[in-house]
């Protein structure tokens, strides 16, 4: 695959098409002004490796943490049956990563873009992600659409018995934890996310503006850390945690977000008993140095939501200019878990 990419750059077509079955054992770097088309292609992570499947060209480099190292106009497009498959779980988790010779947990993202201006990821199925499937940090002017997920639903009980189908009261049994679908982190803005389906072990779409080790590693000098100007439309997923989650803490702003159309499909999924929330904004738990203020979480619109988990909505912390409309509950779900402080 790397040779196809290199050849398309040399001949200046800057578009490569791959088909068939591929085993990936190290990250494929996508250059600027480039389109990779996966046409009836099944890309599977090799057993036992600790690696992303795709990263942008300057990801993880010194210049990649500067405005001069911004990669631009990268497209990953599926045609027909295009699949990114995490394969067999490699055991790397949030509890054991970065210890005893293990790499950081973000090596388990199927796709990790950092400092990219102009991108499109669409018409792809993601299966068996080993952590978050699609992760974006300091990425702007992008489109993520027509993505279908199916996380690993394996659980192992206290006696070592393996079973499938996740249950809220047996979270400790879950093999692959925090297997989100799409994550936008700090510095992301002007992005449309739409038409998201399938099953995720944790959040299906998460806009999480924190300032942890991940964000500090890939922060871009001189650029704003705000997570803003994002629209999320038509999310129809079964999420063991939350269909759409928003969270910011520790001086990072989250604002000007529109969520329009979230339908909790948990009651129709064989993978979970039910989820927690359809939409969740904020958290009572502290992830950073402090909770956000209302001047850091603002201008958020949530409309046309139907939830059937524990609650339809969860609101926590401080926020202002929050607009809610068209919120419905099904299957006896409670409407609102309200832990707001303002």
Located regions from the model:
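Extracellular/periplasmic carbohydrate-active domains that bind, remodel
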Residues: 1-342
């Amino acid at each position: 695959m790397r040779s196809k990419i290199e050849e398309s750059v040399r001949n200046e077509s800057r578009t490569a098409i791959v088909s068939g079955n591929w085993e990936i054992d190290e990250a494929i770097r996508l250059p600027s002004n480039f389109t990779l088309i996966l046409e009836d292609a099944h890309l599977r992570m090799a057993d036992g490796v600790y690696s992303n499947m795709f990263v942008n060209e300057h990801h993880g480099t010194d210049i990649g943490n500067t405005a001069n190292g911004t990669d631009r106009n990268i497209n990953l497009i599926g045609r027909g049956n295009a699949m990114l498959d995490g394969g067999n779980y490699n055991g790397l988790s949030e509890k054991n990563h970065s210890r005893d010779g293990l790499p950081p947990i973000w090596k388990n993202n199927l796709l990790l873009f950092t400092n990219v201006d102009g991108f499109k990821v669409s018409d792809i199925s993601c299966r068996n992600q080993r952590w978050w499937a699609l992760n974006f940090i300091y990425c702007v002017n992008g489109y993520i659409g027509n993505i279908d997920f199916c996380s690993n639903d394996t659980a192992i009980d206290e006696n070592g018995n393996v079973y499938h189908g996740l249950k809220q009261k047996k979270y400790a049994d879950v093999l692959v934890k925090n297997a989100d679908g799409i994550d936008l982190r700090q510095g992301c803005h002007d992005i449309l996310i739409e038409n998201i389906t399938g099953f995720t072990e944790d959040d299906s779409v998460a806009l999480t503006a924190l300032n942890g080790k991940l964000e500090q590693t890939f922060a871009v000098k001189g650029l704003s850390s705000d997570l803003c100007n994002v629209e999320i439309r038509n999310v129809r997923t079964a999420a063991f945690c939350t269909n759409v989650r928003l969270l910011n803490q520790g001086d990072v702003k989250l604002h000007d977000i529109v969520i329009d159309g979230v339908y909790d499909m948990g009651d129709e999924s064989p993978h979970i008993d039910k989820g927690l929330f359809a939409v969740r904004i904020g958290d009572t738990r502290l992830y950073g140095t402090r909770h956000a203020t209302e001047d850091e979480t603002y201008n958020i619109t949530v409309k046309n939501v139907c939830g059937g988990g524990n609650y339809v909505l969860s609101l926590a912390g401080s926020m202002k200019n929050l607009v809610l409309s068209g919120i419905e509950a099904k299957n006896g779900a409670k409407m609102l878990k309200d832990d707001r402080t303002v």
